[in-house]
From Swiss-Prot:
The keyword Transmembrane does not apply. It comes from Mesembryanthemum crystallinum (Common ice plant). This is Nucleoside diphosphate kinase 1. Its cofactor is Mg(2+). Belongs to the NDK family. Keywords: ATP-binding, Kinase, Magnesium, Metal-binding, Nucleotide metabolism, Nucleotide-binding, Phosphoprotein, Transferase. PROSITE patterns: NDPK, NDPK_LIKE. ATP binds at residues 9, 57, 85, 91, 102, 112. One of its GO terms (biological process) is UTP biosynthetic process. The lineage of its organism: Eukaryota, Viridiplantae, Streptophyta, Embryophyta, Tracheophyta. It catalyses: a 2'-deoxyribonucleoside 5'-diphosphate + ATP = a 2'-deoxyribonucleoside 5'-triphosphate + ADP; a ribonucleoside 5'-diphosphate + ATP = a ribonucleoside 5'-triphosphate + ADP. GO terms for molecular function: ATP binding; metal ion binding; nucleoside diphosphate kinase activity.
């Protein structure tokens, strides 16, 4: 089954959106496989966002991620990467549809509440970076009510 990496950024944590965000993924039928509440240091943030290191906003992004605790999670389910991106909404909150996390809770692109893997390959890489110890192998008793 497919897995994705989701991170609630410092603004989402500070604004008390952790429960709401987890609830949206659970209500869709996805399974939480790993969760950490963590303060990220600069080298780790730089490693996570290494693919953006040449962008002009890179330093500001890293400063933002290390400014407070984040919630790092692994979610599992059929099509979870693509569907997770739809639940999250567009990177720019002003382009996000109402009903998405960013459409409902974010205004500025630099404070957009949440990160989600953009492809299965990046999810695999991000999960390995954030959860080198692995994830919890379990299945919800609701699994047969969600999947054919």
């Amino acid at each position: 089954m497919e897995q994705t990496f989701i991170m609630i950024k410092p603004d989402g944590v500070q604004r008390g959106l952790v429960g709401e965000i987890i609830s949206r993924f659970e209500k869709k039928g996805f399974s939480l496989k790993a969760l950490k509440f963590i303060n990220v240091d600069r080298p780790f943030a730089e490693k996570h966002y290494a693919d953006l290191s040449a962008k002009p906003f890179f330093n500001g992004l890293v400063e933002y991620i290390v400014s407070g605790p984040v919630v790092a999670m692994v979610w599992e389910g059929k099509g979870v990467v693509l569907t997770g991106r739809k639940i999250i909404g567009a990177t720019n909150p002003l382009a996000s549809e109402p009903g998405t996390i960013r459409g409902d809770f974010a205004i500025d692109i630099g404070r957009n509440v949440i990160h989600g893997s953009d492809a299965v390959e990046s999810a695999t890489k991000e999960i390995a970076l954030w959860f080198p110890e692995g994830v919890v192998n379990w299945q919800s008793s609701l699994h047969s009510w969600i999947y054919e």
